[in-house]
A protein has these predicted regions:
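A general structural signal for short secondary-structure junctions and capping/turn motifs
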Residues: 31-33, 67, 129-133
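Oligomerization/assembly interface segments of phage tail-like spikes and tubes
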Residues: 65-82, 92, 134-144
């Protein structure tokens, strides 16, 4: 069973980390305006493949309980206004913060944060599906969220 509350906790901790390291307002959600903001836009949630290999936990009285599965949260980091020196600088700061903080501690769980490659076609599809113009961004993911 997936602990749904930890996904928001993970994304909140990610936003807090970016806010701390960039000194800029960080918003969780789809980019919607041109204020000086960094957006963390989660666009895909998947069960981590390694979760399928976990044996059920054995609790007293030999009851087998399924392990909590691990989630990978794919997200885009977008700085607005995007195509300005300030926006590009904020985007570079956010990318650097992700690279310098590869592990976030969420309660008693450590999750991995990393940049990721995203095919141009997939990226264009994400923006098109959301009805917003394609712009420069950082593709990243959180591995191990529970």
């Amino acid at each position: 069973m997936v602990n749904i509350m930890s996904i928001p906790s993970t994304l909140t901790a990610l936003c807090d980390m970016l806010r701390t390291h960039t000194g800029v307002n960080v918003v969780l959600g789809r980019p919607e305006d041109s204020t000086s903001t960094i957006y963390v836009w989660p666009w895909f949630l998947e069960e981590a493949p390694e979760s399928h290999n976990l044996p059920p936990a054995v609790v007293p009285n030999e009851i087998r309980v399924p392990q909590s599965s691990s989630q990978n949260i794919h997200f885009l980091v977008i700085a607005t206004p995007a195509l300005t020196i300030e926006g590009l600088s904020r985007l570079a700061q956010a990318r650097q913060a992700i690279l310098e903080n590869p592990v976030l501690n969420i309660g008693e769980v450590n999750v991995q944060v990393m940049t990721s490659n995203l095919e141009a076609e997939t990226l264009a599809s994400v923006f098109q599906a959301a009805g917003i113009p394609l712009t420069i961004c950082v593709s990243a993911m959180v591995r191990g969220a529970r």
